[in-house]
Each structure stands twice: as C-alpha cells, then as structure tokens.
Amino acid sequence: MDLSRHAHRKDEHLSLAEKFYTPTATSQFDQLRFVHQSLPEISLTDVDFSTQLGPLSLKVPLMIEAMTGGSPRTGVVNAQLGRIAAATGMAVASGSQSIALKDEQAIPTFTSLRENNPDGLVFANIGAGHDVRAAKHAVQMLAANALEIHVNTAQELVMPEGDRDFHWLDHIGNIVAALDVPVIVKEVGFGMAQETLQKLQHVGVKLVDLGGRGGTNFVDIENFRRHQKELNYLDTWGQSTVESLFEARQQPDLQVIATGGIRQPLDAAKALALGARVVGSAGQILHSLIKTDEATTTAMLLDWQVGLRTIMTLLGTTDLTQLRQQRLLLSPELINYCQQRQLTY
C-alpha cells in the first residue's frame, strides 16, 4: 500500500473511532453485579491494587490500550498519551507499528510515546503476520517493555485493502520463542474463545489481551470506509468482553488483560474480579482526549484509580487476590451463554 494512503487510513481510524463512540458499551458488564458488604472491616488506605503481568510489575491494574500512530496527527496523540501514562503511572500500548517498519519517516509518530514516558511501561505493537525480525525492530523502536501482537481477522476481512491470508500461529510461536520481552497476543474488539486460547497456549503464549466486543468496533469503522457499506451485518460479531473473560477462566495458566468497552471503574473492578490481571481502555480515553484535553483526561484516569480503590473497599478486599474471590451475580443471558459453552461460572 502507498505509505501516504496508510497514514491517511490511520487518521481515518482516529476520526471514525470517535464517530462511532457510544457512552454506553455493549461489553455486558451491566449484566454482572457485586454483592455489597456492609461491614468491610478495612480502610481505603489498606487497598493495594498492584498487579503482576508475567515478569512486569504494575502499580496500577489499569492501562492505556493500543490506539494509533503513523501520521503527524497521530504522533501528537501518542505524545499526549505518553504524558498521560507518565502522570498516572499506567502502562501504555502503541498502535500498530506496521507503517513504521516500512517507512522510517513514520517512526517519530510512535517514538513520541516513549519520549514522553521515559520511565514507564510501554508496549510495542505489530500484526500477527510479521516475522521475528519485525517484532524485534518494533520493540527496539520504543525501547518497549513488552510486545503486543494483534490478531484482527474480522477487521482485515471488512477492510477494503485488508489481508486475506491468516496463517498466523507459526509467526506468533516464533516471536514468543525469540523475544526477550513478554509477548501479549491481543484481539481488537471481537473477543477470544477457549479454542483460540488453547491454540495460543500450544505455541507458548502466556499473556493475552481478550479485546472483547463492546468498545471500539472495527467492523463498523472499516465497513464505513467501503463504498457500498454492505457488511453491516457483522457489526455484532464476536464475544463480548465479559463472555471472553468466562472463556479465559477455563485456561488458568494464561494471564489476561481485559479490554473492550471499559467505560468506568466499576467495569474495571468486575473484569479484575473475573480474573483479569490488568484492565485496559482505549476508546473512552481517546473520546476524553478529543472532547476535552490532556489535563482533563489525566484527571479522569486518576479518578478511576480512586474509584477502583473505593469499590474494593466496599467489598472488603485489600488486594486483587481477594477481589478475585468475590462471587458476582450473573444475568440469565450470561448464565445461558456459560451453560451452552460449558464454562464454569
């Protein structure tokens, strides 16, 4: 693809992600309820929500998920995200670096993320069709602490100029074996089923980002870019974030990041209770950044951290291990899903 067209597509994605943003997500967190504890017997200051993701220690179990890069406009956004990550103590993931692997002129639009967050956790990001050499280059480009490999079959098939060949597992296994940083395999809004998770485990994957349905919808975005816009029947394709979390509970050796439709601290708390080590948000953060400014978005994410501590205090849980022991009440729809999929709930 012509590189200027690739950069234009990145700008399109940014604009369309905001166009299709909805304040109410369809990730199904509203179909889960905690049981209130009137006597928690802890104080707010007792709560320690630090977490571990593979060898990485995170003081905050929230992260800024992969969004963008590849054009001057998106380079500015990445600089803002880097500063927000530094101010909030949150990990941050780059958008796909594919364009920067082909065109050196695009590299600064990604390195602005690290330049503005020199001491924080930064995750590189490439597609699953790339080889080990590309993976190492992406990590080196950002001095990254981990690499995300995104699997985005649904997006590619709807994208007019997208890939049509999806022999990815060998690439993923080779990269996991060759890299000296953790490798996270990431969906981009369509969720993961236990069959997928089993395949990933078989090639050595230990960390996954479930990327469930409910947040940014790349079928909607790519279909909008088609002349006929004829693939709208796929706009509900995939497993929700909550369904994906139940799928992942069948694979206890995998460590999970939950993303997809995280709109508030209560969503994050529910995801952590279902087993996620870290919870990520992209669309909500991008929406705040576009509609307000960097300072307001930073304040929002600091408020989320206070909110998560508040919820954990309400439940009488001082750490994430205790939070994961909380039983959640499920809607009939979720119970039905788990029963049909033979998932423990």
UniProtKB/Swiss-Prot annotation:
FMN binds at residues 66-68, 96, 125, 186, 216, 261-263, 282-283. Pfam families: FMN_dh. Mg(2+) binds at residue 156. It is found in: Cytoplasm. Disulfide bonds: none annotated. Its EC number is 5.3.3.2. NCBIfam families: IPP_isom_2. Belongs to the IPP isomerase type 2 family. Involved in the biosynthesis of isoprenoids. Catalyzes the 1,3-allylic rearrangement of the homoallylic substrate isopentenyl (IPP) to its allylic isomer, dimethylallyl diphosphate (DMAPP). This is Isopentenyl-diphosphate delta-isomerase. The gene is fni.
